């Protein structure tokens, strides 16, 4: 499974 980068700040 691909790890999705966390784009929340």
Swiss-Prot record:
Residue positions, PTM Pyrrolidone carboxylic acid (Glu): 1
Subcellular location: Secreted
GO cellular component: extracellular region
Keywords: Pyrrolidone carboxylic acid, Secreted
TM spans (from-to): none
Coarse class of the protein's main subcellular location: secreted
Tissue: Expressed by the venom gland.
Coiled coil (UniProt feature): none
Biological role stated in the UniProt entry: Peptide with unknown natural function. Protects against maximum seizures in a pentylenetetrazole (PTZ)-induced epileptic model. Acts in a dose-dependent manner when intracerebroventrically injected into mice and rats, but has no effect when intraperitoneally injected. Since it does not alter the spontaneous behaviors of the animals, neuropolybin could be considered for further research as a potential treatment for seizures.
Note from the entry: Neuropolybin refers to the sequence pEQWQPQLHR, it is synthesized based on the inspiration drawn from the peptide Ppnp7, which contains uncertain residues.
Protein name per Swiss-Prot or TrEMBL: Peptide Ppnp7
Organism name: Polybia paulista (Neotropical social wasp)
Taxonomic placement: Eukaryota, Metazoa, Ecdysozoa, Arthropoda, Hexapoda
């Amino acid at each position: 499974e691909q790890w999705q980068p966390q784009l929340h700040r």
